[in-house]
Amino acid sequence: MVIRRLYKFCASHVVRNCSSLKCAQNIHGHNYEVEVFIETNRLDNANMALDFGLMQQEMQTFIDSFDHAHHFWDKESPEFQRFIENHCVRYVKCSFNLSAESYALMFLYYLTKILQKSVFSNNEGELKVSSVRVHETKNGYAESFLKDLENPHFKSLVHDHCVSFSQGIQSLWHDKDFFHKIISDEKQCFFHAKPLHQIP
């Protein structure tokens, strides 16, 4: 059984080294759509794989952190990086080039960590993020699958510190330790209470 939730964010970037000069040489933006697919081996007490409302919490917070921000590769020139940091309140510094494929791998990596560190209380089954799709436009998307995180090439692109968020982004988190919890060694960080009204 698989469920899907759609998230959206708007952002600007530059994709270096690609064949399209418009993308490789200019700051430009996209209205991104991120589809997150979660797989389970059984349904919970509400006959749900996972309540969609629960996917509007930590996962939503993480994806919203990329919204209305400039994303830049840490291989950009120091001058360019300083300009962004001095003139943008919201920015995300990334250790990977900013293709849709890289975003798909990155979101899969961090959303998997969030789900693994989440404690649910409604008799949920074994949950996993089976894939993530990232649409830059209506015409195409990149999709990353859980098995990709075992591929040495793909695995080398994403790690705990492959993104860092500006203070302007962090200031809107309800929990100032939100990102630290995602990448920490703690196994249980995000707790979700049992629904109040239960029919046996």
Curated annotation (Swiss-Prot):
Its cofactor is Zn(2+). Coiled coil: none annotated. It catalyses: 7,8-dihydroneopterin 3'-triphosphate + H2O = 6-carboxy-5,6,7,8-tetrahydropterin + triphosphate + acetaldehyde + 2 H(+). Pfam families: PTPS. The keyword Transmembrane does not apply. Keywords: Lyase, Metal-binding, Queuosine biosynthesis, Zinc. Pathway: Purine metabolism; 7-cyano-7-deazaguanine biosynthesis. The active site is at 23 (proton acceptor), 68 (charge relay system), 136 (charge relay system). Zn(2+) binds at residues 13, 28, 30. The keyword Protein biosynthesis does not apply. Disulfide bonds: none annotated. InterPro entries: 6-PTP_synth/QueD, 6-PTP_synth/QueD_sf. Binds 1 zinc ion per subunit. GO terms for molecular function: 6-carboxytetrahydropterin synthase activity; metal ion binding. Belongs to the PTPS family. QueD subfamily. Catalyzes the conversion of 7,8-dihydroneopterin triphosphate (H2NTP) to 6-carboxy-5,6,7,8-tetrahydropterin (CPH4) and acetaldehyde. The active site is at the interface between 2 subunits. The proton acceptor Cys is on one subunit, and the charge relay system is on the other subunit. This is 6-carboxy-5,6,7,8-tetrahydropterin synthase. The lineage of its organism: Bacteria, Pseudomonadati, Campylobacterota, Epsilonproteobacteria, Campylobacterales. The gene is queD.
